[in-house]
Amino acid sequence: MNGNSIIGLIGHPVSHSIGQILYNRIFQDMGIDAFYLAMDVHMNVLPAFLKNSFFLKAFNVTIPHKVSIIPFLDDLDEIASQTRSVNLVIREQSRMKGYNTDYYGLDYALSFNQVEIEEKRIVIAGSGGIARTVIRYMLDHGAHRVDVLTRNAQNARRNLDIPGIGLHENIDEDYDIYVNCTPLGTLGDGDPFSTVDFRSGRTGIDLVYNPPDTPFLKRMRNAGGRTVSGLDVFIGQGLRTLELVFGIRPDSIFREYAVEALNEIRKG
C-alpha cells in the first residue's frame, strides 16, 4: 500500500461500534499505515458528506445509509446490485464503488456455527437493507420457506420487492430459524420476537453484535435452541472488508481482537 490511508464507518448512531478500536489495533500490529475513523453522519447531511469524502480510501456503511447511499455511487458489486444494499464503499480515484459484505458475514457466521439453511423454514424480523441481504442469502442456499415479520406489511412489500416471500405483521406458527434484522436488542434493549414461544431445537440468529448476547438470543437458548451472535457476522464482514481494501485476511487475530474491542467499549 502506498502512503497512508484513512478508512472508516458512517452511520447514525455509531457510538456502539467497535470498529475504530478493532481496526486501528489490527493496523498497528500488522504494520499497516492506516487509520479507522467512526463518523456519525445524519441522513440529511449524507450528500454533503459524500461530496467531501475524498480523504477516505474506503468506508463501511451502517444504518440508516445502506440503501440511501446507492444513488451517489458510481458502481456496485454483484451482491450489492442484487440486494440494493451497501455496507462498504471503496474509492478508486474519483469513482466510488459499493460492496455488500453483509452477505459474506452471514455466510461466515453460519459456517462457523455449522447452521444448515437448505429446506429450513425461516422467519426474518425487519425489512431494511440487511433484511434484503439475509433473504437473498437464504433463498440462494435452498431455504424451504422465507417469511418476514414486519410492523407494516405494505411498506415492507414496497421496500423488499422480492417474490416468493411471505409478509406478516404477527406470527403464530413455528419456524426452524429466526433471524433478527432490526436494531432491537442493541445495547440490550428489545426483542422482535417477544410474543413468540420458541420450541426446543430451533435456531436464533441476531445481526446485532452489541451486546453479543441479546434478549432474543437468551430466550432462544433458554428454550433449548441454539444461537448465532451478530459478533460472528461482524467478524465475517470485517475479514471481507480487509480483504477487499488491503488484500489481507487476518483470521488468526481478528476474532480475538473483536472480542477485546467489544469488552472495552461495553465497559465504557
Swiss-Prot record:
Protein's name according to its UniProt entry: Shikimate dehydrogenase (NADP(+))
What HAMAP family does the entry give? Shikimate_DH_AroE (MF_00222)
* Role: Involved in the biosynthesis of the chorismate, which leads to the biosynthesis of aromatic amino acids. Catalyzes the reversible NADPH linked reduction of 3-dehydroshikimate (DHSA) to yield shikimate (SA).
Q: Which SUPFAM superfamilies match?
A: Aminoacid dehydrogenase-like, N-terminal domain (SSF53223), NAD(P)-binding Rossmann-fold domains (SSF51735)
According to UniProt, this protein's pathway is: Metabolic intermediate biosynthesis; chorismate biosynthesis; chorismate from D-erythrose 4-phosphate and phosphoenolpyruvate: step 4/7
Reaction catalysed by this enzyme: shikimate + NADP(+) = 3-dehydroshikimate + NADPH + H(+)
Residues annotated as binding NADP(+): 78, 126-130, 207, 230
Q: What is its EC number?
A: 1.1.1.25
Q: Where does shikimate bind?
A: 62, 87, 102, 209
Homology family: Belongs to the shikimate dehydrogenase family.
Keywords on record: Amino-acid biosynthesis, Aromatic amino acid biosynthesis, NADP, Oxidoreductase
For this record, an example GO cellular component is: cytosol
Binding partners and assembly: Homodimer.
Going by the entry's taxonomy, the superkingdom of the source organism is recorded as Archaea
Which organism's genome codes for this protein?
Thermoplasma acidophilum (strain ATCC 25905 / DSM 1728 / JCM 9062 / NBRC 15155 / AMRC-C165)
Cite a single GO BP annotation.
amino acid biosynthetic process
Gene, per the UniProt record: aroE
- List of catalytic residues: 66 (proton acceptor)
Q: Name one GO molecular function term.
A: NADP binding
